[in-house]
Amino acid sequence: MAAAVVVDTVIGEITLAHVVVAFCLIQIYITVQIEYEKQQEEQLLQQRISIMISQIQPHFLYNVLTSIRALCRIDAREAESALTDFTLYLRGNLDSLSNTGCIPFLQELQHTKHYVDLEKMRFGRDLTVLFNTPVTQFSLPPLTLEPIVENAVRHGVMQRLQGGTVIISTSETESDFVVTVSDDGIGFDAEQLAAGGKHIGLWNVRERLAAVCGGHMEIESGIDKGTNVTMCIPKCRKESE
Protein backbone atom coordinates (compact mmCIF):
# COMPACT_ATOMS: atom_id res chain seq x y z
CA MET A 1 0.00 0.00 0.00
CA ALA A 2 2.79 2.38 0.96
CA ALA A 3 4.61 1.57 -2.28
CA ALA A 4 1.50 2.43 -4.29
CA VAL A 5 1.25 5.78 -2.53
CA VAL A 6 4.89 6.49 -3.30
CA VAL A 7 4.40 5.58 -6.96
CA ASP A 8 1.32 7.80 -7.19
CA THR A 9 3.23 10.63 -5.58
CA VAL A 10 6.15 10.26 -7.98
CA ILE A 11 3.80 10.12 -10.97
CA GLY A 12 2.01 13.21 -9.71
CA GLU A 13 5.28 15.07 -9.31
CA ILE A 14 6.43 14.03 -12.79
CA THR A 15 3.11 15.15 -14.28
CA LEU A 16 3.34 18.46 -12.47
CA ALA A 17 6.91 18.88 -13.68
CA HIS A 18 5.75 18.26 -17.25
CA VAL A 19 3.06 20.88 -16.85
CA VAL A 20 5.54 23.39 -15.45
CA VAL A 21 8.02 22.70 -18.25
CA ALA A 22 5.29 22.98 -20.88
CA PHE A 23 4.11 26.26 -19.36
CA CYS A 24 7.66 27.63 -19.37
CA LEU A 25 8.15 26.60 -22.98
CA ILE A 26 4.91 28.31 -23.95
CA GLN A 27 6.02 31.48 -22.15
CA ILE A 28 9.38 31.37 -23.91
CA TYR A 29 7.67 30.84 -27.28
CA ILE A 30 5.31 33.77 -26.70
CA THR A 31 8.20 36.02 -25.66
CA VAL A 32 10.26 35.05 -28.70
CA GLN A 33 7.25 35.49 -31.00
CA ILE A 34 6.48 38.95 -29.60
CA GLU A 35 10.11 39.99 -30.02
CA TYR A 36 10.15 38.61 -33.58
CA GLU A 37 6.98 40.47 -34.52
CA LYS A 38 8.40 43.64 -32.96
CA GLN A 39 11.55 43.29 -35.05
CA GLN A 40 9.45 42.64 -38.15
CA GLU A 41 7.41 45.80 -37.53
CA GLU A 42 10.58 47.84 -37.01
CA GLN A 43 12.07 46.42 -40.21
CA LEU A 44 8.92 47.22 -42.18
CA LEU A 45 8.90 50.75 -40.76
CA GLN A 46 12.51 51.26 -41.81
CA GLN A 47 11.66 50.00 -45.30
CA ARG A 48 8.71 52.39 -45.56
CA ILE A 49 10.94 55.27 -44.42
CA SER A 50 13.60 54.22 -46.94
CA ILE A 51 11.07 54.15 -49.77
CA MET A 52 9.56 57.48 -48.76
CA ILE A 53 12.97 59.16 -48.57
CA SER A 54 13.97 57.73 -51.95
CA GLN A 55 10.80 59.17 -53.45
CA ILE A 56 11.09 62.69 -52.11
CA GLN A 57 14.76 63.33 -52.69
CA PRO A 58 15.78 67.02 -52.82
CA HIS A 59 16.32 67.02 -56.59
CA PHE A 60 12.79 65.68 -57.14
CA LEU A 61 11.28 68.34 -54.88
CA TYR A 62 13.34 71.03 -56.58
CA ASN A 63 12.37 69.90 -60.08
CA VAL A 64 8.66 69.73 -59.24
CA LEU A 65 8.60 73.11 -57.52
CA THR A 66 10.58 74.70 -60.35
CA SER A 67 8.10 73.30 -62.87
CA ILE A 68 5.14 74.58 -60.86
CA ARG A 69 6.73 78.04 -60.60
CA ALA A 70 7.23 78.14 -64.36
CA LEU A 71 3.65 76.97 -64.88
CA CYS A 72 2.34 79.82 -62.71
CA ARG A 73 3.50 82.30 -65.37
CA ILE A 74 1.76 80.42 -68.17
CA ASP A 75 -1.38 78.82 -66.76
CA ALA A 76 -2.43 79.59 -63.18
CA ARG A 77 -5.18 76.96 -63.22
CA GLU A 78 -2.79 74.20 -64.30
CA ALA A 79 -0.30 75.37 -61.69
CA GLU A 80 -2.98 75.09 -59.01
CA SER A 81 -3.81 71.56 -60.16
CA ALA A 82 -0.13 70.60 -60.09
CA LEU A 83 0.27 72.03 -56.60
CA THR A 84 -2.71 69.96 -55.44
CA ASP A 85 -1.11 66.81 -56.90
CA PHE A 86 2.15 67.65 -55.17
CA THR A 87 0.47 68.23 -51.80
CA LEU A 88 -1.53 65.00 -51.99
CA TYR A 89 1.54 63.10 -53.13
CA LEU A 90 3.52 64.24 -50.09
CA ARG A 91 0.60 63.52 -47.77
CA GLY A 92 0.29 60.00 -49.17
CA ASN A 93 3.95 59.32 -48.46
CA LEU A 94 3.71 60.60 -44.90
CA ASP A 95 0.46 58.75 -44.17
CA SER A 96 2.09 55.48 -45.20
CA LEU A 97 4.46 55.65 -42.23
CA SER A 98 1.61 55.11 -39.77
CA ASN A 99 -0.01 52.30 -41.76
CA THR A 100 1.28 48.83 -40.87
CA GLY A 101 -1.30 46.87 -42.85
CA CYS A 102 -2.86 47.01 -46.28
CA ILE A 103 -4.83 49.76 -48.00
CA PRO A 104 -7.40 49.63 -50.83
CA PHE A 105 -5.80 49.31 -54.25
CA LEU A 106 -7.76 52.34 -55.46
CA GLN A 107 -6.07 54.45 -52.78
CA GLU A 108 -2.61 53.33 -53.89
CA LEU A 109 -3.62 53.84 -57.51
CA GLN A 110 -4.71 57.41 -56.81
CA HIS A 111 -1.41 58.09 -55.05
CA THR A 112 0.37 56.75 -58.12
CA LYS A 113 -1.66 59.00 -60.41
CA HIS A 114 -0.60 62.07 -58.39
CA TYR A 115 3.02 61.08 -59.01
CA VAL A 116 2.38 60.41 -62.71
CA ASP A 117 0.71 63.81 -63.17
CA LEU A 118 3.72 65.54 -61.63
CA GLU A 119 6.13 63.73 -63.94
CA LYS A 120 3.97 64.39 -67.01
CA MET A 121 4.03 68.06 -66.09
CA ARG A 122 7.82 67.92 -66.31
CA PHE A 123 8.32 65.63 -69.30
CA GLY A 124 5.22 66.35 -71.38
CA ARG A 125 4.74 64.18 -74.45
CA ASP A 126 7.96 62.27 -73.80
CA LEU A 127 6.15 60.32 -71.08
CA THR A 128 3.04 58.25 -71.73
CA VAL A 129 1.34 56.33 -68.90
CA LEU A 130 -1.58 54.03 -69.66
CA PHE A 131 -3.95 52.52 -67.10
CA ASN A 132 -5.76 49.23 -67.71
CA THR A 133 -7.16 48.36 -64.28
CA PRO A 134 -10.51 46.51 -64.50
CA VAL A 135 -9.81 44.67 -61.23
CA THR A 136 -9.69 47.06 -58.27
CA GLN A 137 -11.49 45.48 -55.31
CA PHE A 138 -8.50 44.28 -53.31
CA SER A 139 -5.92 45.58 -50.86
CA LEU A 140 -2.14 45.75 -50.84
CA PRO A 141 0.61 47.36 -48.71
CA PRO A 142 0.99 51.13 -49.17
CA LEU A 143 3.88 52.39 -51.28
CA THR A 144 4.04 49.31 -53.48
CA LEU A 145 2.61 50.30 -56.86
CA GLU A 146 3.93 53.88 -56.87
CA PRO A 147 7.62 53.01 -56.31
CA ILE A 148 7.46 50.48 -59.17
CA VAL A 149 5.96 53.07 -61.50
CA GLU A 150 8.53 55.62 -60.34
CA ASN A 151 11.33 53.18 -61.07
CA ALA A 152 9.89 52.61 -64.55
CA VAL A 153 9.76 56.35 -65.20
CA ARG A 154 12.99 57.50 -63.59
CA HIS A 155 15.31 54.60 -64.44
CA GLY A 156 13.50 53.26 -67.50
CA VAL A 157 11.68 55.35 -70.08
CA MET A 158 13.14 58.74 -69.18
CA GLN A 159 16.63 57.39 -69.73
CA ARG A 160 15.79 57.20 -73.43
CA LEU A 161 16.10 60.36 -75.53
CA GLN A 162 12.69 59.76 -77.08
CA GLY A 163 11.01 58.91 -73.77
CA GLY A 164 8.60 56.00 -73.65
CA THR A 165 5.49 54.36 -72.26
CA VAL A 166 4.53 52.81 -68.93
CA ILE A 167 1.50 50.50 -68.75
CA ILE A 168 -0.21 49.71 -65.43
CA SER A 169 -2.67 46.82 -65.50
CA THR A 170 -4.58 44.55 -63.13
CA SER A 171 -6.09 41.09 -63.45
CA GLU A 172 -6.90 38.12 -61.25
CA THR A 173 -6.49 34.36 -61.12
CA GLU A 174 -8.25 31.84 -58.91
CA SER A 175 -5.73 32.45 -56.13
CA ASP A 176 -4.23 35.91 -56.69
CA PHE A 177 -4.86 39.51 -57.60
CA VAL A 178 -2.22 40.52 -60.14
CA VAL A 179 -0.75 43.99 -60.74
CA THR A 180 1.63 44.47 -63.67
CA VAL A 181 3.80 47.47 -64.53
CA SER A 182 5.47 47.32 -67.95
CA ASP A 183 7.74 49.85 -69.63
CA ASP A 184 9.73 50.12 -72.85
CA GLY A 185 12.66 51.83 -71.17
CA ILE A 186 16.34 50.95 -71.20
CA GLY A 187 15.91 47.94 -68.90
CA PHE A 188 18.59 46.61 -66.56
CA ASP A 189 20.49 43.49 -65.62
CA ALA A 190 18.59 41.50 -62.98
CA GLU A 191 21.80 41.26 -60.93
CA GLN A 192 21.54 45.00 -60.30
CA LEU A 193 18.43 44.35 -58.23
CA ALA A 194 20.17 41.78 -56.06
CA ALA A 195 23.07 44.16 -55.54
CA GLY A 196 20.80 47.06 -54.57
CA GLY A 197 21.91 50.31 -56.19
CA LYS A 198 19.41 52.51 -57.96
CA HIS A 199 16.80 49.73 -58.03
CA ILE A 200 16.76 49.29 -54.24
CA GLY A 201 13.15 50.52 -54.21
CA LEU A 202 12.05 47.38 -56.07
CA TRP A 203 13.85 45.19 -53.55
CA ASN A 204 12.11 46.99 -50.67
CA VAL A 205 8.71 46.55 -52.31
CA ARG A 206 9.35 42.83 -52.78
CA GLU A 207 10.31 42.39 -49.11
CA ARG A 208 7.31 44.34 -47.79
CA LEU A 209 4.89 42.60 -50.12
CA ALA A 210 5.97 39.22 -48.75
CA ALA A 211 6.00 40.33 -45.10
CA VAL A 212 2.70 42.23 -45.02
CA CYS A 213 0.37 40.17 -47.20
CA GLY A 214 2.25 37.03 -48.21
CA GLY A 215 2.53 38.24 -51.79
CA HIS A 216 5.40 37.93 -54.23
CA MET A 217 6.91 39.96 -57.05
CA GLU A 218 8.51 38.86 -60.31
CA ILE A 219 10.80 41.03 -62.43
CA GLU A 220 11.68 40.51 -66.07
CA SER A 221 14.20 42.92 -67.54
CA GLY A 222 17.14 43.13 -69.87
CA ILE A 223 19.41 45.81 -71.27
CA ASP A 224 17.49 47.71 -73.99
CA LYS A 225 14.54 45.33 -73.57
CA GLY A 226 12.35 47.22 -71.12
CA THR A 227 11.07 45.94 -67.79
CA ASN A 228 8.03 44.00 -66.65
CA VAL A 229 7.20 43.88 -62.92
CA THR A 230 4.37 41.66 -61.66
CA MET A 231 2.97 41.70 -58.13
CA CYS A 232 0.76 38.82 -56.94
CA ILE A 233 -1.43 39.39 -53.86
CA PRO A 234 -3.03 36.20 -52.45
CA LYS A 235 -6.83 36.22 -52.26
CA CYS A 236 -6.82 33.96 -49.21
CA ARG A 237 -5.03 36.71 -47.27
CA LYS A 238 -7.82 39.14 -48.12
CA GLU A 239 -10.53 36.70 -47.03
CA SER A 240 -8.84 35.95 -43.70
CA GLU A 241 -8.35 39.59 -42.68
Predicted regions located by residue number:
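Two-component histidine phosphotransfer core
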Residues: 8-56, 60-218, 230
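Juxtamembrane "helix-exit" motif on the non-cytosolic side of transmembrane helices
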Residues: 2-8
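A short beta-strand-to-loop motif within the catalytic HATPase_c
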Residues: 219-223
